[in-house]
């Protein structure tokens, strides 16, 4: 499959998720959940990929949160701006999403924890409000908690099913393409300009950097460590 065919296939999948899952929810209102979920997956996989650094003996998602010491968390947050525990990763939340009766509040707590992990650090201003438009308790998702959770689980599962490959340069391209595609299509269907969309500031930076062909230096600003070996690894 050529890169253009791969991109077209991915766009069809994403648009299907955006339309099939939302049900009666207005597409313009639902946009932040699709974009936010894609963003959540992106930062989770970026985070894990940096920690593992190609080492097959490390699987960050399978580590217990208890292995993260205050020193590791502090050092990582100082270095990379925020911290995310293994249990908070997209892959782990999605794995149990369908049977999780508190999914909406669990997601809200995770997003709040990611943002608050930067409190007191130089990155606080950049991280604050990162998930502000991803309101997991909004009635836009449904009138009951069950309805909200069902829709959130469907979005998580849909985004998890997207074939984005390993987290390398090509995947960064695909995430950027997905954002650009969704923004332009939502805007066109709502009769609005793309500039009216909320896009996480770091994704905006990502897309801008990608267009300037700066992939070799891109780290997205969201990385951490889960071992002394990772802590001592050079950063670029």
Located regions from the model:
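Non-catalytic, mostly N-terminal accessory regions of nucleic-acid modification and defense proteins
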Residues: 1-206, 210-211
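Conserved S-adenosyl-L-methionine
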Residues: 193-236
């Amino acid at each position: 499959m050529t890169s253009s065919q791969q991109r077209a296939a991915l766009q069809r999948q994403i648009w299907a998720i955006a339309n099939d899952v939302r049900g009666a929810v207005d597409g313009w209102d639902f946009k932040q959940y699709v974009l936010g979920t894609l963003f959540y997956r992106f930062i989770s996989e970026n985070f894990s990929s940096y920690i593992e650094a190609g080492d097959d003996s490390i699987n960050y998602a399978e580590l217990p949160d208890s292995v993260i010491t205050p020193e590791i968390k502090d050092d990582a947050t100082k270095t990379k701006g925020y911290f995310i525990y293994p249990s908070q990763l997209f892959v782990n939340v999605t794995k149990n999403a369908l049977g999780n009766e508190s999914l909406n509040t669990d997601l809200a707590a995770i997003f709040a924890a990611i943002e608050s992990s930067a409190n007191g650090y130089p990155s606080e201003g950049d991280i604050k409000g990162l998930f502000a438009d991803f309101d997991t308790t909004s009635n836009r998702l449904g009138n009951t908690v069950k309805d909200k959770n069902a829709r959130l689980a469907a979005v998580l599962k849909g985004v998890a099913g997207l074939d984005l490959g390993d987290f390398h340069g090509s995947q960064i391209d695909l995430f950027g393409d997905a954002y650009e595609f969704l923004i332009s299509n939502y805007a066109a269907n709502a009769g609005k300009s793309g500039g009216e969309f909320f896009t996480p500031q770091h994704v905006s930076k990502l897309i801008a950097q990608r267009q300037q062909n700066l992939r070799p230096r891109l780290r997205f600003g969201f990385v951490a460590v889960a071992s002394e070996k990772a802590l001592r690894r050079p950063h670029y």
